[in-house]
Amino acid sequence: LEEKQLSNRIQEWVRDGGVWVVGPFTDIRNQNGAKYKDRHFGTLEDFIGIDWLYGIPENGKLMKAEWNDHTLCSVNTWADLWKGNSDGTLAQVTAGHQAINGQTIYGMYCIGKGKVILLGTLPVGEDMDRILSLACRYAGITYKRAEKNIMLARRKGTNREGIILAEYAGKGGVCHLDKADGRMTDILSG
């Protein structure tokens, strides 16, 4: 995030109303590819007002977490845990070592007119759906899940409208578009 003032540009975009879904492996290395000596994240901790506590390799066998509505959420591959404004906590650790119980694993923080949704683990399935639905709702985007690992969002700009499809699990997938959607052109490949 240090190159070409990207961090500053993202922060300005969020303050102006953007919704940034970030983590868990974002902003952990400097522009030389080295870890920061004095903090885990480069600018995220100061920007959203949190203190990173732990980074733990975890596959959900030793640590359990729950969303604020008490439904279970998965802990997949890695767990970054932090403390900060508890109003921003979306999900927290509920079982594991006493030092980590109650720590935030997913959080959402209001910055200016926008929001930062910080992921402490790699969301899958229903957890990814929940995060995408939340982010799209705050961004004013209609969200639809096309398949288990594909999201679909309709977008309308000044000169054109379209659909953004994103595969987020590295598995490939298919999305069948309705005939009502009309003729479409892939803007990347033509």
Task: Give the location of each predicted region.
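A conserved amphipathic helix/loop scaffold
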Residues: 2-190
